[in-house]
Amino acid sequence: MRYAIMVTGPAYGTQQASSALQFAHALLNEGHELASVFFYREGVYNANLLTSPASDEYDLVRAWQKLNTQHGVALNICVAAALRRGIIDETEAGRLELPSANLQPGFTLSGLGALAEASLTCDRVVQF
């Protein structure tokens, strides 16, 4: 089956994002296709390059990035939610005349159209 995941919880503070990542790995291990992960609302914090967990904590942001590089899973974050929460890429930093970007490599700023497309092209969309 072809799946998409929507994550609405931050990298730290709730179980949503870590549960979503575990579910993503379970899907791939069972031979399913994971087309994309869409980060919405507080979920956009999973794409913050500046997140720096303690050395004895799991680095969820880099784990998502690893999912992208190893399995080619698209990591889309809602551009409106991201900008409201201070998550920006180089293009937006330039447009807004900000000194730098903080979007973790592997993530892409996207509109809700990416979520709509996933809903239309996947067999299941699972929200965390």
From Swiss-Prot:
Keyword Metal-binding in annotation: no
Source organism of this protein record: Salmonella dublin (strain CT_02021853)
E.C. no: 2.8.1.-
Protein name: Sulfurtransferase TusD
Task performed by this protein: Part of a sulfur-relay system required for 2-thiolation of 5-methylaminomethyl-2-thiouridine (mnm(5)s(2)U) at tRNA wobble positions. Accepts sulfur from TusA and transfers it in turn to TusE.
Localization terms from the record: Cytoplasm
NCBIfam families: PRK00207.1 (NF001237), sulf_tusD_dsrE (TIGR03012)
Keywords carried by this UniProt record: Cytoplasm, Transferase, tRNA processing
